C-alpha cells in the first residue's frame, strides 16, 4: 500500500428535516389540535483514531464525505427519522486542520479517540410546539437547520519515542531492523527507504519504546532535494533523535561534511526540531580496521565539533546495539516519569482560595524561607 501522509477532504453534515404544520382530523375530533411532528436531525461526521490504519491513502481518492439529511416530520405527531452519523477512521497521529483558517480541530493521539468534525443540523419544529393559550391552532413550523460544511487538511505525524536521522545509506534501516520488529527494505543503493517505518523495540516483556525511520536527507533537502524533507514532520513528536553517521563511506565521501549537512537542513526546516535532544551514533564500525577505529572516531568528533553523547555501533553485526538500546530506554523512562509528575502536580490558583494578591507587610501573613 502506498504511504500517504497528507490529504484534503470536504465533509458535509446532513441537514435537519423540516417540521410540519398538521392538525388532527378524526371522526369524533373534526377540530382536533395541532399534531405536526418535528424533523429528524441531520447526520454528523466523526473522525475516529484507528491503530490498524497507518496511511491516509483512502482520503487521497475519496475527497468528499456527506452525511444524509434528517427526514421531515409528519402529521399525527410523527417525528422524522434522524440520519445515521458517519465515522471516518484515520491513523493514530493524524492532525485535522481547517483548510480555510488553519484552525487545529483535532489531534488524534489515542486509539479509539472520537472527534466531531461536522455537526448535523437540528430538526425543525412541528406546529405542536407553537400551541399556546392564545393560539390554539398554530400554523407556524420551522425548517431544519443546515449541517456544517468544512474543508479539512489531514496531516499524519507518526507517534514515536525515537527518530532516526541520517544520509541515504547511513544504515538507519539496518539499525531499526536489528533492534526492533520492523522489516524495512534494505539494499546497497541510496533512497532504499521511500516512506517512514515504525518499529517497536522491546527491552523486556514490559519495557518497550517506538522508533521511527524516515527516508535519508541530503544537502539541499530543505529546498526540495531528495525525499526526506517531506517526512521530517514525523520526527516532531519524538523525544530523542539519533543522528546515524556512516563512518566508512564509499567513494571517499567526507562523513563530517555529510553530518554537518544534516544538521544544517534540520535547522532550516524547524528550529524546534533542531533543538530537540540528539545523540550521535557512528555506524559501520565493522568496516573500519580495528586498529584505526579509535583514531577515526576521535578525529570525526573533533572535526564535527560534537559535545553530546556518542555511541559506536555496527548495525550489521549488532555490535554496540544492545548498549545503545539500554541507554535509550533509560532516557525515555526518565522523560516519561517527568511528564507524569507534571500531569499530576496540582495547580494552585490564588483566586480559588479567595486571595488576589499578598502584601508582604500584611500582619496576617508570615513569609517562611
Swiss-Prot record:
An essential GTPase which binds GTP, GDP and possibly (p)ppGpp with moderate affinity, with high nucleotide exchange rates and a fairly low GTP hydrolysis rate. Plays a role in control of the cell cycle, stress response, ribosome biogenesis and in those bacteria that undergo differentiation, in morphogenesis control. The keyword 4Fe-4S does not apply. Monomer. Its EC number is 3.6.5.-. GTP binds at residues 166-173, 191-195, 213-216, 283-286, 314-316. PANTHER family: DEVELOPMENTALLY REGULATED GTP-BINDING PROTEIN-RELATED, MITOCHONDRIAL RIBOSOME-ASSOCIATED GTPASE 2. Keywords: Cytoplasm, GTP-binding, Hydrolase, Magnesium, Metal-binding, Nucleotide-binding. GO terms for cellular component: cytoplasm. Belongs to the TRAFAC class OBG-HflX-like GTPase superfamily. OBG GTPase family. Residues 160-333 form the OBG-type G domain. One of its GO terms (molecular function) is GTP binding. The gene is obg. Coiled coil: none annotated. This is GTPase Obg.
Amino acid at each position: 500500500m502506498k504511504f500517504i501522509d497528507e490529504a484534503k477532504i470536504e465533509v458535509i453534515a446532513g441537514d435537519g428535516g423540516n417540521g410540519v404544520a398538521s392538525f388532527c382530523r378524526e371522526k369524533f375530533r373534526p377540530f382536533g389540535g395541532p399534531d405536526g411532528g418535528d424533523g429528524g436531525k441531520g447526520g454528523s461526521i466523526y473522525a475516529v483514531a484507528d491503530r490498524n490504519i497507518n496511511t491516509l491513502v483512502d482520503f487521497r481518492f475519496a475527497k468528499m464525505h456527506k452525511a444524509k439529511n434528517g427526514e421531515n416530520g409528519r402529521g399525527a405527531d410523527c417525528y422524522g427519522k434522524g440520519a445515521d452519523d458517519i465515522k471516518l477512521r484515520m491513523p493514530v497521529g493524524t492532525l485535522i486542520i481547517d483548510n480555510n483558517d488553519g484552525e487545529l480541530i483535532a489531534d488524534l493521539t489515542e486509539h479509539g479517540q472520537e472527534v466531531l468534525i461536522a455537526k448535523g443540523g437540528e430538526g425543525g419544529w412541528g406546529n405542536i410546539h407553537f400551541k399556546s393559550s392564545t393560539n390554539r391552532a398554530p400554523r407556524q413550523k420551522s425548517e431544519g437547520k443546515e449541517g456544517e460544511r468544512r474543508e479539512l487538511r489531514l496531516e499524519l505525524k507518526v507517534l514515536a519515542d525515537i527518530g532516526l536521522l541520517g544520509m541515504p545509506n547511513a544504515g538507519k534501516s539496518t539499525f531499526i531492523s536489528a533492534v526492533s520488529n520492523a522489516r524495512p527494505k534494505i539494499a546497497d543503493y541510496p533512497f532504499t527507504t521511500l516512506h517512514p517505518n515504525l518499529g517497536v523495540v522491546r527491552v523486556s516483556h514490559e519495557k518497550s519504546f517506538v522508533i521511527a525511520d524516515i527516508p535519508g536527507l541530503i544537502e539541499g533537502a530543505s529546498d526540495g532535494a531528495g525525499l526526506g524533507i517531506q517526512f521530517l514532520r514525523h520526527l516532531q513528536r519524538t523525544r530523542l533523535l539519533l543522528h546515524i553517521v556512516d563512518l566508512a563511506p564509499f567513494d571517499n565521501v567526507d562523513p563530517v561534511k555529510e553530518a554537518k549537512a544534516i544538521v544544517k537542513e534540520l535547522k532550516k526546516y524547524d528550529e524546534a526540531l533542531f533543538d530537540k535532544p540528539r545523540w550521535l551514533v557512528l555506524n559501520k564500525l565493522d568496516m573500519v580496521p580495528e586498529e584505526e577505529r579509535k583514531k577515526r572516531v576521535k578525529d570525526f568528533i573533533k572535526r564535527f565539533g560534537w559535545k553530546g553523547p556518542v555511541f559506536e555501533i555496527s548495525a550489521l553485526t549488532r555490535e554496540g546495539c544492545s548498549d545503545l538500546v539500554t541507554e535509550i530506554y533509560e532516557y525515555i523512562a526518565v522523560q516519561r516519569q517527568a511528564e507524569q509528575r507534571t500531569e499530576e502536580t496540582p495547580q494552585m490558583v490564588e483566586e480559588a482560595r479567595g486571595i488576589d494578591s499578598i502584601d508582604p507587610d500584611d500582619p496576617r501573613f508570615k513569609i517562611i524561607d
